[in-house]
């Protein structure tokens, strides 16, 4: 994030590189927001984004975009690294534990616990500016990104906080051995078809421990 911000001019060149993509949002946010005052919704979103963003930066990621309650993050910008996939998975684990701790604080304040859904994927993406001269926006697009977003939505039907695409699991296995315990926490769910994709993708899910519910 800091390196990208150092550029005085927009990144005009479009390039393709391999990245890890993370999407996270609050489960049931729309229904929750309907019952809250607008000011309270904004306060909760700020608290959520602050906690989530801290974990992204701690793991070397970049926040690509805030979309309502959702956060879109990328690992591997501006330069690809051997730990990008592991860092994304490690970040997801930190998000789960961070929200669990936050829920403990919320319970003391008489507030309902929050659940999150995270989708992770790994693969090639197109990176560059979109828009026009009057309004350029740096973006990361491609099937890898779209699939990560679909995996995030799949957390609802699998009732899990985390769904991971097999390409990311494979990349973690090929990376540093220190990341191996992260894979041990995942369960292989086999091939699944995602909305908007013709081919199936093998997915892995995370099961919550008692302390995280």
What would you call each of these model-derived segments?
Residues 9-90:
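Catalytic NTP-binding/metal-coordinating core of nucleotidyl cyclase/transferase enzymes
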Residues 21, 71, 116-122, 203:
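A structural signal for short, well-ordered beta-strand segments
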Residues 41, 48, 67, 84, ...:
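Helical mechanochemical/support elements of P-loop NTPase systems and associated helical scaffolds
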Residues 46-61, 77-118, 143-154, 181-185:
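Alpha-helical scaffold within the catalytic cores of cyclic-nucleotide enzymes
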Residues 67, 108-119, 161-168:
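Acidic/histidine metal-binding catalytic segments
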């Amino acid at each position: 994030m800091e390196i990208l911000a150092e550029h005085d001019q927009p990144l005009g060149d479009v390039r393709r590189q391999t990245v890890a993509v993370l999407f996270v949002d609050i489960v049931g946010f729309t229904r929750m927001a309907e019952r809250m005052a607008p000011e309270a919704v904004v306060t909760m979103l700020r608290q959520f984004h602050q906690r989530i963003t801290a974990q992204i930066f701690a793991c070397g990621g970049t926040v690509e975009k805030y979309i309502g309650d959702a956060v879109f993050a990328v690992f591997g910008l501006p330069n690809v690294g051997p730990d990008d996939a592991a860092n994304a998975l490690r970040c997801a684990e930190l998000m789960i534990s961070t929200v669990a701790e936050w829920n403990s604080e919320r319970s003391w304040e008489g507030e309902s616990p929050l659940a999150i859904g995270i989708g992770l994927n790994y693969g090639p993406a197109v990176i560059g500016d979109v828009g026009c001269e009057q309004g350029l926006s740096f973006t990361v697009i491609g099937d890898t990104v779209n699939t990560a977003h679909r995996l995030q939505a799949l957390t609802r039907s699998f009732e899990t906080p985390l769904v991971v695409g097999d390409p990311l699991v494979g990349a973690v296995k090929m990376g540093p051995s220190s990341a191996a315990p992260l894979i041990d926490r995942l369960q292989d769910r086999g091939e699944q078809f995602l909305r908007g994709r013709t081919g199936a993708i093998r997915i892995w899910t995370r099961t919550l421990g008692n302390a995280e519910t």
